[in-house]
Amino acid sequence: VQFTNDVGAWVAQQRWYAGKSHEPRFRILDARPVPGATRYLLMDDAGSLPALYHVPLTVVASPTTPDSVVGREADGYLIDATQHPDFTIGMLAEMGVDVSRVTGSRVLTGEQSNTSIVFDEDGQPTIILKLFRTLHHGENPDVTVQRVLSDAGSPFVPRFLGSLEAEWPDVGREHGVAHGTVGFAQEFLRGVRDGWTIALEAAREQRNFTEAARDLGVAVAGVHGALGAALETADATPEDVTATAAAWRRRLAIAAAEVPAVADRSAAIDAVYRAALERPWPRLQRIHGDLHLGQVLAVPDGGWRIVDFEGEPLRPMEERAIPDLPPRDVAGMLRSFDYASALGAGPDGGGWAAACRAAFLEAYAGAGGSVALDPVLLNALVLDKAVYEATYEARNRPDWLPVPLAGIDAALAPQSLG
């Protein structure tokens, strides 16, 4: 019991622990030896839904960082094994990655939901391992999608190197066993900057960003084309359309109840939704699912790499693998340009954002792999995104609420309605 309490107390203090709103109630679901550590799986039963945490631990005589210490043992200190090279290099080797040239590793700080470890080969950082802290049964879209894109030779994602699966007891599943991905490794991109930081600077300085926006349009189209060729696609059925419309209206009802300005516009928004339901819909396929400027990296020799294909964080994992509308990714990027403009340049940044949007759309439409963009359907998806943003900002950052409200008004303007 004391061991579980010590480990649980440490887990509850970590940034990746998702149960901040409740008092945790942990139990050890599984513990098995792995190279360099013991992999503990802790179930937190205290929330509305149980959550399973991945906690590899090892014992050392002397810890290298105080934050890694989980507790004391008779023979030393119990620490987070992600801080120990025997475990991290062992995990890489389990994935089938050649570790013969690995000379060191370090844990990246700032991660919110996972733990990322960078490995040096011959003194240069070349590999990054993402260790998932919250585990889910079944496919992880971040792994599946990046593997497929890398295998297809896509120049728009980091090269995929390997992944590692684990299984654990689950009485609710066939044979009493669940399985899922505990981590994956890919090429580490040196000297990159995220698109959000670059775009924000450009908007603040009113620098032309249209060439970068065009390159982004080509990259997103290329990813859509590769995913459509390699993974399942499907025609949008009447049931798909009905379910999408219900989700739009559910988010609109929530926003209208919390944001008076959205309530004032709800009839006009719903009219756009109704019009979109009558338009031709593209085939459904795998998409990024949570695309914005923070999910793209500019590499030093030019071009973009798209990362973090986990999908919308609030959606259940199994839903994120379901084929979806490619224009949803496009809408996410259009809204991201608006955010960069509003926060970087203020009220005078509308022209900058409009130029970025136009350049992105033109390049996407003309690139190989792109999906036809019906303007009314795209506008409905932009509206849905802005409506969701309005709820989020009203709850968390009221000072930012004007940004999605301006986006809603722009999408309702006559020239946006197709």
Residue ranges and their predicted role:
Residues 1-30:
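Short Lys/Arg-enriched alpha/beta "domain-start" segment
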Residues 19, 24-54:
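Exposed beta-strand-loop-beta-strand "reactive/processing" segments of non-cytosolic proteins
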Residues 37, 45-250, 302, 311-345, ...:
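Conserved ATP-binding subdomain of kinase catalytic cores across diverse folds
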Residues 100-104, 251-287:
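An alpha-helical support segment within catalytic cores of ATP-dependent transferases
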Residues 286, 305-308:
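Pre-DFG segment of protein kinase catalytic domains
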Residues 290:
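Conserved catalytic-loop position in the HRD/HxD motif
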Residues 294-298:
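Hydrophobic residue at the +6 position relative to the catalytic HRD Asp in the kinase catalytic loop
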Residues 348-351, 355-372, 376, 380-418:
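ATP/Mg2+ or Mg2+-diphosphate-binding catalytic cores
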